[in-house]
């Protein structure tokens, strides 16, 4: 396939099909940056060319095996593939995720396949998307059904093109801490007082970044 093989997802759950598309997208980005470092800092053209060769193979594999046709949403990215025609349609809250592809630098947020994928994964077609009385968003197979992850909410805001969507998510994040004043790993979409991990620094950091990008970046 040209892609890198994964045994486990960012959530630490085992892969079903072992070519994890978001991880390969992230690897492609890093290989491009590594090539730039090799040229500019190390003056090692051979190393740069090898990094770009591997990057090209990964991207070709993603395009060949990681994009599938959905009857409702059109061309979308699969979460996992095996290179033999099998694939898993889902997205997990943990990063790298399909939702995070523009944040990682793999593609622009207006990319049509990404927009199709985003519409799909932010719907109940995604088995890890949960809608409750208080919140809706992407969760994870790592936690119970119905639990939304603040990491995914923050990433939804960071990759949104709409200021109103960013503001709505910030209000949701700040309003679902159950009085802890910190982001949790996950919380129950019907009742945020039911949560996992009272303090999850990864989610804290992404929430802070979303607030900075939305309100402060242009003024500092």
Regions found by a protein language model. Give the residues of each.
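Heptad-repeat amphipathic alpha-helical coiled-coil interaction surface used
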Residues: 28, 32-35, 55, 208, ...
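Short coil/turn linking the two alpha-helices of tandem helical-hairpin repeats
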Residues: 35, 39-42, 162, 215
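Extended ligand-binding clefts on enzyme/binding-domain cores
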Residues: 1-28, 40-41, 48-149
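Short, flexible helix-adjacent loops and helix caps
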Residues: 39-43, 67, 188, 219
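C-terminal capping/lid segments that line or modulate ligand- or cofactor-binding pockets
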Residues: 88-108, 146-220
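Inward-facing hydrophobic residues that define packing positions of alpha-helical scaffold repeats
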Residues: 31, 118, 169-173
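Structural signal for well-ordered, non-membrane alpha-helices
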Residues: 35, 59-63, 174-175
């Amino acid at each position: 396939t040209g892609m890198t093989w994964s045994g486990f997802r960012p959530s630490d759950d085992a892969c079903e099909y072992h070519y994890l598309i978001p991880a390969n997208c992230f690897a492609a980005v890093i290989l491009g940056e590594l090539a730039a470092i090799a040229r500019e800092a190390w003056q090692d053209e051979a190393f740069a060319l090898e990094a770009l060769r591997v990057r090209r193979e990964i991207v070709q594999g993603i395009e060949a095996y990681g994009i599938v046709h959905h009857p409702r949403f059109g061309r979308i990215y699969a979460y996992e593939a095996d290179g033999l025609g099998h694939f898993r349609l889902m997205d997990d809250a943990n990063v790298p995720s399909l939702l995070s592809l523009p944040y990682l630098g793999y593609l622009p947020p207006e990319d049509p396949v990404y927009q199709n994928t985003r519409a799909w994964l932010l719907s109940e077609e995604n088995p890890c998307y949960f809608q409750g009385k208080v919140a809706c968003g992407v969760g994870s197979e790592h936690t119970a059904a119905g639990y939304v992850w603040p990491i995914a909410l923050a990433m939804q805001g960071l990759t949104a093109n709409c200021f109103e969507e960013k503001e709505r998510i910030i209000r949701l994040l700040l309003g679902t801490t159950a009085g802890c004043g910190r982001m949790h790993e996950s919380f129950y979409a019907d009742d945020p007082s039911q949560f996992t991990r009272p303090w999850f620094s990864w989610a804290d950091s992404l929430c802070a970044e979303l607030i900075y990008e939305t309100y402060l970046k242009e003024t500092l």
